[in-house]
Amino acid sequence: MDKIVIASRESRLAMWQAEHIQARLQALYPHLTVEILGMTTQGDQILDKTLSKIGGKGLFVKELEQALMDGRADLAVHSLKDVPMTLPDGFALAAVCEREDPRDAFVSNRYQHLSELPAGSVVGTSSLRREAQLRARFPQLAVKPLRGNVQTRLKKLDDGEFDAIILAAAGLKRLGLAERIQGELAPSESLPAAGQGALGIEIRADRADLSALLAPLNHPDTRACTAAERALAKELGGSCQVPLGAFATLADGTLTLGGLVAHPDGSVVLTASASGPADYADALGRAVAKKLIDAGARPLIAAVLAEPR
């Protein structure tokens, strides 16, 4: 093998992520030519509706998977939080790279913290998960949908459409925009999405050669944490259409996982947590999901999915 092609969305953040993997591969394997195939996905094209209305985050992935299947690309680089909890047959996650900041970030030109926002202030977010947690903590705020790439969202804030917006801290930091962050929200304030802040590298399952090549990019601690998070989300049918959070930390071989399911209006927020050995990440995810189910997650999810949005 003397050449590898990386499939990537064409947004600045996605291209940064692809170029980051490109640079790491070239450093590991100087004889390799590593190219990037930029692609526009359905999720990038449909900007007038929230993700929960148009089919969810999988819309950012399908075209890249097609490029892998067609042989136009060898691997695809994704924000792991955008990758469906169950991959289509024939695909595999070859590596999960070391996580950037997993937290949500508060961005505003006028205020330092969410608690400073006056009643009626307009806060923009693309995520039902963030919306539900915002509404639960700050029912006096007006939460409005916010789509587009990072630069588009910041421009909408700067143009006065919003008093504040909530974005993933990792994306801002990767783009050199950390100075726009007024503060990161602790997981206790805004529980992140499963996989948030981590990059996943997807390949065709029959490419054992690539699996070995990519092994040095895999970060075991991040893989264990995100495996627990994704197992929880999978057990609950995780999608963009239901506010669902999952975040794990690892210390001394023990994983601690927190999970959340909520109604988008913040009227109901269910939380659960548990700890277990890192070697049993999937089982821990299922255990925390069961706690949420025992607390009423199934009827809550069914009610949310039945509501027109």
Swiss-Prot record:
The modification S-(dipyrrolylmethanemethyl)cysteine is found at residue 240. It holds the Pfam family Porphobil_deam. Its cofactor is dipyrromethane. InterPro entries: HemC (IPR000860), Porphobilin_deaminase_cofac_BS (IPR022419), Porphobilin_deaminase_N (IPR022417), Porphobilinogen_deaminase_C (IPR022418), Porphobilinogen_deaminase_C_sf (IPR036803). Keywords: Porphyrin biosynthesis, Transferase. Pathway: Porphyrin-containing compound metabolism; protoporphyrin-IX biosynthesis; coproporphyrinogen-III from 5-aminolevulinate: step 2/4. GO terms for biological process: protoporphyrinogen IX biosynthetic process. It catalyses: 4 porphobilinogen + H2O = hydroxymethylbilane + 4 NH4(+). One of its GO terms (cellular component) is cytoplasm. Binds 1 dipyrromethane group covalently. The keyword Transferase applies. It is an enzyme of class 2 (transferase). Its EC number is 2.5.1.61. One of its GO terms (molecular function) is hydroxymethylbilane synthase activity. Gene3D superfamilies: Periplasmic binding protein-like II, Porphobilinogen deaminase, C-terminal domain. SUPFAM superfamilies: Periplasmic binding protein-like II, Porphobilinogen deaminase (hydroxymethylbilane synthase), C-terminal domain. Monomer. The porphobilinogen subunits are added to the dipyrromethane group. Tetrapolymerization of the monopyrrole PBG into the hydroxymethylbilane pre-uroporphyrinogen in several discrete steps. Belongs to the HMBS family. This is Porphobilinogen deaminase. It comes from Chromobacterium violaceum (strain ATCC 12472 / DSM 30191 / JCM 1249 / CCUG 213 / NBRC 12614 / NCIMB 9131 / NCTC 9757 / MK). The gene is hemC.
